[in-house]
């Protein structure tokens, strides 16, 4: 199968985030996103974009990108540089499903409605950046997911 034909036959999924201090909740989001299609693209916030939102990443973009690329659910990592790039990404990568955490419900509906399926996934209970680091619950599953 040619790469061009494969692009059109595969169900393509995209998600966005900073994925700084990667934890089990992130791994679960990526696993569930991958289950929704054949090819998962992660748009990773650049250091500059994070700074524009008033956030400073603990790990650099390149370090976070390397960690995400090591996760078996992730097929491609691309930079997220602006809020408005989502529409362009949908077209450029032939996206079928846009996936993000349910804390963003409604935020991107107007921008993406009719262009692709929009899926808001619930947060993993008791896990997340808000609960602090390190997140120990489910650590073995997270470690296993890092091995391709």
Give the role of each language-model region.
Residues 2-148:
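Nucleotidyltransferase catalytic core that binds NTPs
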């Amino acid at each position: 199968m040619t790469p061009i034909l494969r692009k059109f036959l595969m169900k393509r999924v995209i998600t966005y985030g900073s994925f700084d201090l990667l934890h089990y909740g992130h791994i679960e989001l990526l696993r569930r996103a991958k289950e929704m299609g054949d090819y998962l693209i992660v748009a990773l916030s650049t250091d500059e974009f994070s700074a524009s939102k008033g956030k400073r990443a603990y790990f650099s973009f390149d370090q976070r990108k390397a960690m995400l690329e090591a996760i078996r659910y992730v097929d491609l990592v691309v930079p997220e540089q602006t809020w408005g790039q989502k529409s362009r990404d949908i077209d450029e990568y032939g996206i079928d499903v846009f996936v993000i955490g349910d804390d963003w419900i409604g935020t991107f509906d107007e921008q993406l409605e009719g262009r692709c399926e929009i899926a808001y996934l619930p947060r993993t209970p008791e896990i997340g950046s808000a609960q602090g680091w390190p997140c120990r619950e489910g650590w073995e599953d997270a470690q296993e997911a890092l091995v391709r």
